[in-house]
UniProtKB/Swiss-Prot annotation:
Subunit text: F-type ATPases have 2 components, CF(1) - the catalytic core - and CF(0) - the membrane proton channel. CF(1) has five subunits: alpha(3), beta(3), gamma(1), delta(1), epsilon(1). CF(0) has four main subunits: a, b, b' and c.
Family: Belongs to the ATPase A chain family.
Record has Disulfide bond as a keyword: no
Name by which UniProt lists this protein: ATP synthase subunit a, chloroplastic
PANTHER family (UniProt xref): ATP SYNTHASE SUBUNIT A, CHLOROPLASTIC (PTHR42823:SF3)
Location, primary (coarse class): plastid
Species this protein is from: Staurastrum punctulatum
Length: 248
């Protein structure tokens, strides 16, 4: 049996694919705590981008808006319409900042994973990646969403809010409680899985066919990243609206 050069190349390609990693964490040691440094660094970058755009778009408000102000106003109107549709005309205004923050943070985080070459930035240990590429970030967003609709329901309906857990029968109390936690957690796992899968697919394709095939996949990744941000924010707003209206 002869081993041809082509077969060696094919085995080499397979080895490169098998070497693609999910990610190496970069930790900060603070006392006895280990903090995910790469998540904090990239999150600060995302927050900095959002604050910069907000500052540039609102520092000199004009009757005839410039391009940046026009863009900021369009985004704000989009978020207000989303919150109004899901929460309701009477209650949505108080929740526009929360829903908008969720949507914009997830959207910019997802796009940063597709557009910013984080892996080219060398660190002593580990590597940088989009904030939503870490399960800790998405679970934290899910817990914030859970806290938000618990607060919304209790603030609007008082102690009667907890009566929904006894419907339609008290036997379902544990399941109803579990459901309120699993709904946002399912969002977090979906978001994490989609962003991680997108980065892994691009990494595998780059190892096989550099520059050619990955480009369409990157555009597809940008589209799905935007859709994931919209889904998370829309369902979070829907859960908040449902908690204030009652159990359906």
């Amino acid at each position: 049996m002869y081993i041809t050069e082509a077969s060696i190349d094919s085995y080499s390609s397979l080895y490169q694919i098998s070497a693609v990693e999910v990610g190496q964490h970069f930790y900060w040691e603070i006392g006895d705590l280990r903090v995910h440094g790469q998540v904090l660094i990239t999150s600060w970058v995302v927050i900095g981008i959002l604050l910069t755009v907000a500052f540039l778009g609102t520092r000199k408000l004009e009757t005839v808006p410039n391009a940046t102000q026009n863009f900021v106003e369009y985004v704000l109107q989009f978020i207000r319409d989303l919150a109004r549709t899901q929460i309701g005309e009477e209650e949505y205004r108080d929740w526009v900042p929360f829903v908008g923050t969720l949507f914009l943070f997830i959207f910019v985080s997802n796009w940063s994973g597709a557009l910013v070459p984080w892996k080219l930035i060398e660190l002593p240990h580990g590597e940088l990646a989009a904030p939503t590429n870490d399960i800790n970030t998405t679970v934290a967003l899910a817990l914030l969403t859970s806290g938000a609709y618990f607060y919304a329901g209790f603030h609007k309906r008082g102690l009667s809010y907890f009566g929904k857990y006894l419907q339609p029968t008290p036997v379902l109390l544990p399941i109803n409680i579990l459901e309120d936690f699993t709904k946002p957690l399912s969002l977090s796992f979906r978001l994490f899985g989609n962003i991680l899968a997108d980065e892994l697919v691009v990494a595998v394709l780059v190892s096989l066919v550099p520059l050619v095939v990955p480009i369409p996949m990157m555009f597809l990744g940008l589209f799905t990243s935007g859709i994931q941000a919209l889904i998370f924010a829309t369902l979070a707003a829907a859960y908040i609206g449902e908690s204030m209206e009652g159990h359906h």
